[in-house]
Design a protein with these regions (language model features):
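Short, solvent-exposed loop/turn segments at secondary-structure boundaries
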Residues: 24-28, 59-64, 97-101, 163-165, ...
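Soluble or luminal CAZymes and related metallo-dependent hydrolases
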Residues: 28, 32, 64, 68, ...
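Active-site beta-loop-alpha junctions enriched in small/polar residues
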Residues: 16-20, 52-55, 90-94, 124-128, ...
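Active-site acidic/histidine proton-transfer and metal-coordination neighborhood
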Residues: 39-47, 52, 56-152, 236, ...
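Short amphipathic alpha-helical segments, especially helix-boundary/capping motifs
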Residues: 9-14, 46-50, 85-87, 111-117, ...
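Catalytic-core regions built around general acid/base machinery
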Residues: 30-42, 106-113, 168-169, 207-211
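Histidine-acidic metal/acid-base catalytic patches
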Residues: 1-11, 41, 69, 74, ...
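Glycine-rich, proline-tolerant flexible connector loops at the mouths of alpha/beta enzymes
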Residues: 14-41, 94
């Protein structure tokens, strides 16, 4: 898969290390880690992110989250010792006003893990989560004193159709963003569905990339395929990767932003 992604033309890659997935950080043995490390070192791709899913919704889940974040951090350093990728996750459901102080206190423990493992943890606002927009993530980060290893993931598909303007959300998120995820959101039969980046035409990726770049962001713009897409009958991951690449390469051209690669 790494070589295939490189052959399509991408500059970077993200690995899903969630429980039960192929690269599950709790299951990936030393032999496979060495193989992945070699493949990445020999590839033009940068490994920019490891995706987890560890919402700290109660004390038990917080304990699980802390353990899995430590496992993911270890994997990050095993795969790219000189520049370990960040770890990203959502924070789960609930009503924001009711759970935000609890989330803040639990994230304080995450920051200790990030500091101990020399790894960045990036929290992702999700439209169905308690933390659902950039302002929420910024509140948590600032409440904890802007720790350098606690950042956020920006994904406009979670803010679309919510009276949250693209430019405004970027302005709020930009100082704290370590990773940008790109996928489309569309309204179908009164519901919001996710699609491949550029497929629905609902998000101006050229404007998004341009504003982030002008604001000093130099991290990854990651093409994310939603489970709403990958779970469909007949889903073709290779075709999806090619479609996303073509759409986002064009967005970079429209933005007038030069892409950087592993070899730069």
């Amino acid at each position: 898969a790494i070589q295939t992604v490189a052959d399509i033309g991408y500059d970077a890659i993200e690995l899903a290390v969630r429980s039960g997935w192929d690269a599950d950080s709790a299951k990936l043995d030393a032999k496979r880690r060495r193989s992945l490390r070699t493949q990445l070192a020999d590839s033009p791709l940068r490994l920019t992110s490891l995706m987890e899913d560890v919402p700290p919704t109660d004390d038990r889940q917080q304990a699980v989250a802390l353990e899995r974040l430590k496992l993911a951090a270890g994997l990050a350093h095993d795969l790219v010792p000189d520049a370990p990728p960040l770890l990203q996750t959502v924070l789960g459901g609930g009503k924001w006003d009711e759970v935000r102080t609890q989330l803040r206190d639990r994230l304080a423990e995450w920051v200790k893990v990030a500091d101990e493992t020399d790894t960045i943890i990036a929290i992702k606002p999700h439209r169905s989560g308690a933390m659902s927009q950039p302002a929420d993530a910024v509140w948590l980060i600032e409440q904890l004193g802007n720790p350098p290893r606690l950042r956020m993931v920006y994904d406009y598909s979670h803010y679309a159709f919510r009276d949250l303007a693209l430019t405004d959300t970027i302005r709020t998120a930009l100082p704290h963003t370590a990773h940008v995820a790109l996928k489309d959101a569309a309204r179908q039969n009164g519901k919001i569905v996710f699609q491949l980046a550029g497929e629905a035409g609902t998000i101006d990726y050229g404007a998004l990339i341009r504003q982030f770049h002008r604001g000093g962001y130099r991290g990854d713009f990651n093409c994310e395929v939603s489970g709403m897409v990958s779970s469909q009958p007949g889903y073709d991951p290779l075709a999806a990767a090619k479609t996303c690449y073509a759409n986002l390469a064009e967005a970079f051209r429209q933005a007038g932003v030069e892409r950087s690669s592993h070899r730069d």
